[in-house]
Design a protein with these regions (language model features):
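Conserved RNase H-like, two-metal-ion catalytic cores of nucleic-acid enzymes
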Residues: 1-36
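Metal-dependent phosphoesterase core characteristic of DEDDh/y 3'-5' exonuclease domains
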Residues: 6-11, 39-156
Length: 156
């Protein structure tokens, strides 16, 4: 993602568990990203409700005997707090599917996986990524002026 605009720089890569295995996919993620670099800012996770991904990745890495994947131990950007604030401080109704054009939550993904409906999983991931990026770009374009407005309230 562009640090200037919040827009995508490359193409979306979907690592598909049904074409490989979970351990192999997680290993590929670790090899092909700078996640394990000692420099804290080499890989900055950006997402919505990163606690969900954190818990999943941490547990699955442990199960597979992979290096610890702790996406919350270094700098990260989680837009969930913005969604909560936009909903007046309420957690309820602050999911990405409630504040963007994302049509549904991810509850059906395990079902689709179990019955082999992989095209629906890919469509879901693409929709989620598209709506997240659209929201992220929108925030990047508006927050600088919000900061300027806020700065005008400073008394010093």
């Amino acid at each position: 993602m562009s640090p200037a605009s919040g827009d995508v720089i490359g193409r979306l890569v979907i690592l598909k568990a049904w074409e490989s295995c979970e351990k192999e996919i997680m290993g590929k993620f670790l090899r092909e990203t700078s996640f394990l670099d000692a420099y804290d800012f080499s890989f900055i996770p950006v997402g919505y409700n990163l606690g969900f991904e954190h818990n999943f990745l941490k547990r699955r890495a442990e199960v597979h005997g992979l290096p610890d994947i702790d996406i919350l131990s270094k700098p990260f950007i989680d837009l969930r707090v913005i969604g909560i604030l936009m909903k007046g401080g309420e957690f309820k109704g602050s999911g990405l599917n409630k504040i963007t054009g994302k049509e549904r939550d991810g509850m059906m993904v395990p079902v689709w996986n179990k019955v082999g409906d992989y095209d629906k999983i890919v469509e879901y991931v693409e929709m989620e990524a598209r709506e997240f990026v659209r929201f992220n770009v929108w925030l990047y374009s508006r927050f600088p002026s919000l900061f300027i407005e806020w700065k005008k309230t400073w008394d010093y």
